[in-house]
Amino acid sequence: MPTIDISIEDFSKLIESDHLLTVNELDNLISFAIAEVDSEPDGPDENGHTKISIDIKTSNRPDLWSAEGLARLVKGNNGTLGLPDLSSSPSDYKIIVDPETEKVRPYIAAAIVRGLKFDDFLIKQMIQIQDKLDYSYGRKRKRSSIGIYNINMISSPIHYKMVDRDFEFTPLNFENNMSIKDIFSNHPKGIEFGHILSKSKKVPILVDSEERVLSLPPIINSHDVGRVTTESKDVLIETTGTDKETVLIALDCVTQALRDRGGAIESVEIIYQSNIEITPQNTPKEIKINPKIINSYLGTTFTNDQIITFLERRRHNVVKIEDELLIKYAPWRKDIHHWVDISEDIAMASDYNTLIPTIPKVVTSGKISPSSEDENMLREIFIGMQLIEVMNYILTDPIILSNKIDKPMNNSTKDIVEIKNPITSTFSVIRSQLLPILLSFESKNTHIEYPHKIFEIGEVVKNIQKNLLTKTHAAVLLTGSNETLETILSVLDGFMRLQNLDYLLEDTDDKMFISGRRALIKINDIPIGKIGEINPSILNNFGIEVPSAGLEIDLTKIPNLRIKEYDTNKL
C-alpha cells in the first residue's frame, strides 16, 4: 500500500482547520479516508513544516495518494458536502495524436492548470503524487505516466508522434543533446524505464508546433520545457499509457490536487485519427441504490435522509428518484462498480464502530468436498512422478486456444466461451482445454534448464449447444531433448495403474500432435482424453525450440472419481 509524506501545518490549512492538528487528531481524521499515521513526526524544518508519514490502506483509491486527496475526503466529514468541483474552462491547446502511437502507447490525456504559486514545498508535493501514481497505479510507468511542463513555453498544437531512436533532444538535468538511443543507455531514467519501449523500433515523443520537445514518454522530460520551477505559474499536465481508464484517472488525480491548491483548470482537445476527446473528465458517473437493500445488507435502519447525508460526506451528490437514490460520483472513483461499494461508503461515513455485529442465525462447518479430495489425490500422484504443478488463470487469450494451435477462431473453436466485456484481450475467453495453456506457460520459461515436467489440474468450460459445461481436466507437458511419446505414455500408464483402470489408445487426427505419434485415450469405449508428441509447427507458434510431449484427460469421465461436470446455465 502507498505511503505518503505530508506536512501537518499544510494539511491543517488544506482542511481549513482553525488550529494546528495534533498527531492524534490527524490520525482520527484520516481513519475515515482508510489511512493512518505511519510514524512519529519530525520536528518543524527550516520552512516550518512538520513532516509525517501516512500509510494509505487502500490500493484502489489513487485519488487519496496525496495530501490534497486526503484533505478533500476529510473535509467531507467536516461539513464540505457533495461532489468536488469538476469544471474546466476550454483552452486553445490541442494535442494531435499520430496513428502510429497506437501500436506502442495509444492513449493520452492532458489539462492546463493556471494561477499556481509554486514554492519548493509544493514542487516536492507535486513530484510525490506524480511518483506514487507512476510507480503504483501506473505499474512503474508501463500502464500510465505523468508529465508536467511550463505551459508558457509551449505553442499549440502539440504533436504526439513516433520518431526514430536517432532523434536527439536535451533530457532533463542534462546540458547537451542526446539521441534517444543514448538516453536509453546512459541517462538514469532511460536505464530504469527504457525496457518499456524496448520492443518498438520507433518511440513516442511530444513536440509543440515549433518542434520544441516536451518529453519522451514515459522516460524523461526535456530540460527546457519539461522543468517546473518556483517561477512557474501555469502548467500543462499530460498522461500517456496503454490503458485508457488509467490514463484518465491519473490525470484527474493530479489536476484535482492542483485545483485544491488554488489552480484554475482548463481542458485540452485530444485529436485522434477517428475521434476528438476533451480532457480532463468533468462528468460525474452515476449508480442507483435501493435504501432498503442497503439497510438489509448493513443491518441498519438508516432513513433516506441519513443515507443522503452519509453519501454527501463521502463527496457524492444524491438525487431521490421514487424509492431509489441516484448517486453521482467523481470519475476517478474506479473502485465503485456495484451498490455494495456504495454501502461501504455509507458504513464508513456513519462510522464502522457504530455498526452492531450479529451472530449468524445458521451455524455450519465446512469441509473439503469429495471432488476436491479426489483432485488432491491426483495431485499427489503426479507429484510422486516428479512433475511440478502449475496454476494458470481460467481466463486466457483466445489466440492461445486458436491460432497458436493452428485452429483459427471459427467453427473449429465454437466451443470457446467469450467474455462479453473483457478488460483486456489477454483475458477475454474462458479456457476450454489445458494443454495449450501449459504450452503458453512453457513458452515463458524457455530460459530455465531442461527438462521441464509440469502438470495442471483445473476447470475448463465448453460451449456445447449453448450449454456451458464446466469440467475438470488434468494435463501434463514434458519438454526436453529426450521427451517422446514413450515418456508421456509412461506417465499415463502409471496414472491408470494407480486408479486400477484399463484403457485403450486409438489413432486420432488431432493436429496438435505429430501424425503417427498421437492417440485418443478411451475407457470403456468412451473417449476421455488425448496424448502425443507436440507438432513442431505448434511448438514454433509458441517459440519453443525443444521437443515436447503431452496429454490431457477429462477427469469427469473417469468412472471411479467423484469429480462431476455441471451446467453453468443451471446454477
Region spans (language model):
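Extracellular ectodomain segments of secreted/surface proteins
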Residues: 1-2, 280
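Extended, well-folded interaction surfaces typified by the phenylalanyl-tRNA synthetase beta subunit core
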Residues: 2-44, 48-110, 125, 142, ...
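TRNA-recognition modules of translation machinery and tRNA-sensing kinases, especially anticodon-binding
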Residues: 79, 110-279, 283-286, 388-571
